[in-house]
Amino acid sequence: MDRFGSDKPDTRFGLELFDIGDIILQSEFKIVRDTLENGGIVRGIRIPGGAKFSRKDIDDITKLAVSFGAKALANIIYNEDGTAKSPVLKFVTEEQAQAIKERAGAEDGDIIFFVADKPKLVYDIMGRLRLYFGKRLDLIDESKHNLLWVVDFPMFEWSDEEGRFM
C-alpha cells in the first residue's frame, strides 16, 4: 500500500509512491499540516519528464484526482534549468522543495504530484493515479506478467462507516 497505493499493485512498472509528511510538517503549508496532525498522510508520485505537461494537462489530471475523491492535487514542477515552479512554493522553502525532490528521486524536467488526506483515501487516489500514468506514459508492457505474492497483509481493516475493525 505504501509503495503502490494498492494491495494488488501492478509491478510491471515503477512510479512508486513516497512519503513527504515529515518535510511538510516543517513547512507553512497549514492545510496539509493540519491534515497530518489529525492522523492523515501525504504521499507523492514522481512523473519523469512531466515538466513538459501543459497547464491543461495538469488541470485534467487534477480533475481526475478529484473524481477519485481528492480534495485537491498539489504539484511541484522541477524545470530543466533546475528551478522549481508551483503554487505550493508559497508555503514551502526552497530547501524543503529540494528535500521533496531528493525524497522523490526527481530530476530536472520531472513533476511531482501529491495528496494529503486519510490514509485509505490517499492510497486509493494515488494508486489509481499511478495506474493512470502507467497507461498514459506507456510504461506497462501488456505482454508481460509480473505475479506478486502478498504475505504481510492486514487481517483486519478499519471501517469508518462501522467504527470498528472488520
Where are these regions (language model features)?
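Class II aminoacyl-tRNA synthetase catalytic cores and aaRS-like
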Residues: 1-166
